[in-house]
């Protein structure tokens, strides 16, 4: 099953195994994912399920969105996400929660990384710094040459330079689900995941573990 869920990052903690081994985990709150639309090959050309999660004030919902949510008979959510579906059937109004995952399962977690603002090449691209002494002056953290001379007479696209860092879509693959708390809708995943506390996360079964 390739379907995933949208969750919210609660932060990190650690849990202990029966042998006393400490495992760092990220706590992800899986709020009920309400199905807003089920797409089929006959009507849409592919199979997918569209879900919404959370809440949004009525004043922030457009007329088109309000009609879409009303047709599915679900409350307006803060975001809408679509998952391709290989098997299974869903109807508008159904709910998907953390119970679709099991302890020991591998998952891919996608989120927006923390924004770092404008950063230089050392922090952004792990460039090495130049000599601190030996005649170097004011050039300790400069990137160095960014191209050739008259030929080609330009800087190539994709050149690693200073610029905005972070605030981009990042996926961490094959993280282990340590524990599933269905009563509190919590998913405990081994290791760190992208983004700040409170940010949206998309949790899917690991692509490299599906065979």
From Swiss-Prot:
GO cellular component, one term: cytosolic large ribosomal subunit
Keyword rRNA-binding belongs to the record: yes
Source domain of life: Bacteria
GO molecular function ontology, one term from the record: structural constituent of ribosome
PROSITE patterns documented for this protein: RIBOSOMAL_L3
Modification after translation, per record: Methylated by PrmB.
PANTHER family, A to Z: 50S RIBOSOMAL PROTEIN L3, LARGE RIBOSOMAL SUBUNIT PROTEIN UL3C
NCBIfam families from the UniProt entry: L3_bact
Family membership noted in the UniProt record: Belongs to the universal ribosomal protein uL3 family.
Record text on subunit structure and interactions: Part of the 50S ribosomal subunit. Forms a cluster with proteins L14 and L19.
The name this protein goes by in its record: Large ribosomal subunit protein uL3
Natural source organism: Pseudomonas syringae pv. tomato (strain ATCC BAA-871 / DC3000)
């Amino acid at each position: 099953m390739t379907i995933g869920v949208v969750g919210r990052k609660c932060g990190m903690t650690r849990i202990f195994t029966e042998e006393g081994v400490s495992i760092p985990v990220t706590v992800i709150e899986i709020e009920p994912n309400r199905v807003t639309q089920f797409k089929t090959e006959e009507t849409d050309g592919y199979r997918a399920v569209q879900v919404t999660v959370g809440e949004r004030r009525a004043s922030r919902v457009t007329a088109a969105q309000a009609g879409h949510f009303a047709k599915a008979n679900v409350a307006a959510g803060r975001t809408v996400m679509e998952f391709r579906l290989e098997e299974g059937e869903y109807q508008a109004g159904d709910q998907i929660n953390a119970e679709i995952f099991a302890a020991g399962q591998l998952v891919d977690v996608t989120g927006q990384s923390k924004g770092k603002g404008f950063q230089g090449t050392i922090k952004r691209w792990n460039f090495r710094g130049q000599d601190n002494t030996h005649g170097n002056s004011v050039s300790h953290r400069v990137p160095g040459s960014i191209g050739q001379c008259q030929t080609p007479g330009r800087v190539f696209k994709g050149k690693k330079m200073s610029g905005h860092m972070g605030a981009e879509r990042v996926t961490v693959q094959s993280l282990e689900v340590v524990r599933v708390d269905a009563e509190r809708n919590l998913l405990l995943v081994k290791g760190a995941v992208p983004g700040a506390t409170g940010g949206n996360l998309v949790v899917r079964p690991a692509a490299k573990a599906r065979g």
